[in-house]
Design a protein with these regions (language model features):
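Short, aromatic- and glycine-rich surface loops/edge beta-strands on solvent-exposed regions
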Residues: 121, 163, 178-188
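Contiguous beta-strand segments within globular domains
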Residues: 45-118, 144-146, 220-231
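Low-complexity, Pro/Ser/Thr- and charge-rich linker/hinge segments at domain boundaries
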Residues: 18-46, 194-232
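Glycine-centered tight-turn motifs at strand-turn-strand junctions
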Residues: 130-177
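Short acidic/polar inter-strand loop motif in beta-rich domains
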Residues: 9, 153-157, 186-198
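Beta-propeller blade termini and top-face loops
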Residues: 1-59, 66-67, 76-78
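Mature extracytoplasmic or organellar-lumen-exposed domains after removal of signal/transit peptides
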Residues: 187, 200-202, 233-374
């Protein structure tokens, strides 16, 4: 459908089938319209990177629509916060010339604490397993959200996400298999999730125009999921190592500043810190060499990252190199787990010593639970 206006605007609607069924769904709070078959493929990047690549601002490009299964839905619920409802009521009173009562402190406190409502779209595979959740801001009328055919990435949970850099990729999971999928819609208000639309089926199909297609799509996905589980473990290890460094720093500060603590334990802390640094070098490489541009072997995280870089935009068989990188990273990480377990036990031993000496709080210790009124 092509539309043009006298204001020089020009619109092209690639799929307006939802509008044909809109009238019968106006009375419902929410509806997910029937979806046409979604074609799964990897977007081409002829300029080497996303968009205009390195061509400069003089090279004009326009963004393509997002790649994925397009979910068109109708939402007819206001989902206003208490503050929004109060202000709306106050405007009516002002318009009538009536007095506006100032809200109570409890009302204001409740408004300050109230989270804005949101929608959760859940994607299920044909067996009913949840494979992805997408959070969306509620908006009245006909809207669209796109599932990028990706499963949930197994990297660390983050409160905020940022746009990938020029040479980076957005955090993503492996590409799902073709087949039947389902999507449901929940609204969440004040922490209470309410089902608005139950599982709605849709079909996804691979475009098979590949030079070197994988013999088994299932085996390819199994390898990618295996790699993603390794990423899950290595990412978690990185966070634990960061916490261990913080714990050791505070333990050392306590020994140096608090009375009646054995200062000879500083040497013990330094030994554990060196142990932590050695583990970090295995995980992420040697920063002393990196700062001086000196060559070094690939770290565990680097090997995992290379496999993901090679395989996440690829539908061919894993290469011998990718299999070798996974095997090497897995074997090395098994040793790291053993070392980190020993390190954690040693740090807990020092923290127990601080507990016995009634030292004030340091990260990793629940000192507040030991207090009682005197």
């Amino acid at each position: 459908l092509v539309l043009a206006t006298f204001g020089r605007s020009f619109y092209i609607l690639d799929d307006y089938s939802a509008l044909s069924n809109l009238s019968s769904n106006l009375a419902s709070k929410a509806t997910i319209f029937e979806m046409k078959k979604s074609l799964m493929y990897m977007d081409a990047r002829p300029l080497g990177l996303r968009g205009k690549g390195s061509q400069g601002e003089s090279h004009y490009t326009a963004k393509n629509p997002p790649l994925g299964a397009v979910i068109t839905y109708f939402f007819n619920d206001t989902l206003k916060t208490s503050k929004d409802l109060r202000r709306k009521a106050e405007k009516k009173l002002i318009k009538k010339g009536e007095d506006v009562v100032y809200p109570t402190l409890n009302q204001l406190r409740a408004e300050d604490r109230q989270e804005k409502p949101y929608l959760i779209f859940t994607i299920y595979d044909n067996d009913g397993n949840e494979i992805r959740k997408m959070v969306e801001k509620p908006s009245l009328g006909v809207n669209r959200i796109v599932w990028d055919f990706r499963m949930t990435p197994q990297s660390n949970i983050k409160l905020k996400t940022s746009q990938p850099g020029r040479y980076g990729e957005a955090n993503a999971g492996p590409l799902a298999l073709p087949g039947t999928y389902y999507v449901s819609l929940h609204k969440v208000v004040d922490g209470l999730a309410t089902l608005m639309v139950d599982k709605t089926p849709f079909e996804c199909e691979w475009l098979e125009e590949l030079s070197l297609p994988a013999e088994s799509k299932e085996a390819l996905l199994a390898f990618q999921q295996k790699v993603d589980r390794l990423r899950k473990a290595t990412d978690a290890a990185g966070e634990v190592l960061s916490e261990d460094k913080k714990r050791l720093q505070f333990i050392e500060a306590a020994i140096k500043s608090y009375p009646a603590l054995d200062i000879k334990l500083i040497e013990k802390v330094k030994q554990l810190d060196k142990m932590r640094d050695d583990i970090s070098i295995s995980m992420y490489g040697d920063p002393s060499l990196s700062r001086r541009d000196l060559e070094q072997n690939e770290s565990i995280a680097s090997k995992v990252g290379i496999v993901i870089w090679n395989m996440w935009r690829n539908r061919s068989e894993p290469t011998q190199t990718n299999n070798m990188l996974y095997d090497n990273a897995s074997s090395e990480f098994e040793k790291v787990i053993s070392q980190m377990t020993k390190l954690d036990a040693e740090i807990k031993g020092l923290e127990k010593y601080l507990e016995e000496k009634e030292v004030p709080f340091t990260p990793g210790r629940g000192l507040i639970m030991n207090w009682s009124k005197e």
